Amino acid sequence: MKKFKNISITFLILISLGVLNSCESVLEVEPESSISDEQFWKTNEDAKLGLAAAYDALQKAYRTKRFYWGEFRADNYVNSEKPQPDTQDLINNNLTPESSTEYLQWDEFYSLIFRANLAIEKIPEIPYYDTQYLGEAYALRAFAYFDAYRVWGGVPLFTKAELTFSDDAIKPRSSAQEVLDLVLSDIEEAEKNLTVVSSDYTFSKLSLLAFKAQVHMYLNEYEAANTALTSLIASNQFSLTTNRKQWRDLFLNDEINYPGEGQEGPELIMSIRYDFEEDGNRASGIYQVFFPGVPSYYVAPNLVEEWETKFPTDSTAWATKYPNVPPHVFEENEDTGELNAKYGDYRYYESIAAPGTQEEDLRISKYHKVNISPSIDDTNIILFRYADMLLLKAEALNQLGQPTEAIELVNQIREARELPLVNSGTIPDVVNINDKDELEDFILSERRLELLAEGYRWWDLVRTNKAVEVMGPINGLTQDRIIWPLWFRHLIDNPKLEQNVPY
């Protein structure tokens, strides 16, 4: 995918949007060859190269934003003694239009949208064009606009590749509903055109089903979400990992402790791929965001408490709750080579580490186990994973009045993770499966543990209308501040933009 990424397709210009500084700071990609628009889009190979440019923009747009948007406004983290503005404003619910460009600036998103627009315009002009490429372009545009919808609500809506300076290029915000309507329409167009069943790093029929399910779950459209999830699961293309190493290898990119391991597994539906040799320094943003040398945040104590209450790490507490369940976590004694039992959930030990001398110095260790320079980071970002899909389906089934089937899906994951089944201990899980609200909270808790540091928790709280309930007592979040502010510079550069209330 990426080896073609440095070939420029056209002289790319978008003004206004508040993307950069008026006429002198347009959104542009300098042409590296003299190939013109008219000369280029002639063959399916050209279409493939054009899409490579769009996926390159996807890499840049999501390298840190996926985590700043989906993780740090939720209850998984607390500030450290040396907080940094990037995360402090998020954790404290102190967002302003002057907050970090890491999560408020939308330049790279419109670069992605422009490149998708260009492909959507030009591919149908190619004789005997491959509809797969057109489907990918629609899927990429839908993906970008859906996140814009979740973050800002209404945004300037571009459906054509604007190539000239004109008044039409300076647009006000469309309504949130108009943005959502385009997302849903683009998903339909992608469905009509995609032909590839599955692909690790590009949109396919199955990754589109995963995306479609996420969209409908966000909109509380449970029948539609369940239909998409049923089709995805019935494909039998994906399965759960069944041991600690397999689960760890889904995420791990740690050449110091685990050279040559990780970034693969049967649960991965689609990821954004990064490669240091192809993409250069700081290609991915995971090392930058998680496990930094001087942490600006720690894993929240209430998350640790929730995890250890469900799956005790103390042998006595485990034996009390699960007297007939032996531990499945073992670690080798470095001196004797003996395997010693550890109690609890191996996901806990793989996801959280305490490298410092203080017990509360807990950091995310899901992707790497020690501090590694962000300059060499090429960790893939997982967009869709099978366990996420099963838990979404469990949620949907609960809302559709099928709690027993919902618990069966939760137990599929528990069994795969070598954990006791729901309500199997002498101290039952705190859930009445016949109470829809209780079961929803329980499934969200299972998601919190399984999907930690993957960019889901904040959006889970928002889509289930629990953001204020959970975060209000922690940082004073109110309903009107769930939406994000527009970056102040975008408002200066485009006077037609209006700021979100109450910012």
UniProtKB/Swiss-Prot annotation:
Gene3D superfamilies the record matches: 1.25.40.390
Subcellular location: Cell outer membrane
InterPro entries: SusD-like_N (IPR033985), SusD_RagB_dom (IPR012944), TPR-like_helical_dom_sf (IPR011990)
Chief place of localization: membrane
Induction, per UniProt: By ulvan and rhamnose.
UniProt GO cellular component terms: cell outer membrane
Organism superkingdom: Bacteria
The entry's keywords: Cell outer membrane, Coiled coil, Membrane, Signal
Signal sequence segment: 1-21
Family recorded in the similarity comment: Belongs to the SusD family.
Protein purpose: Polysaccharide-binding protein probably involved in ulvan degradation. Ulvan is the main polysaccharide component of the Ulvales (green seaweed) cell wall. It is composed of disaccharide building blocks comprising 3-sulfated rhamnose (Rha3S) linked to D-glucuronic acid (GlcA), L-iduronic acid (IduA), or D-xylose (Xyl). The SusD-like protein may mediate ulvan oligomer-binding before transport in the periplasm for further degradation.
Protein name: SusD-like protein P38
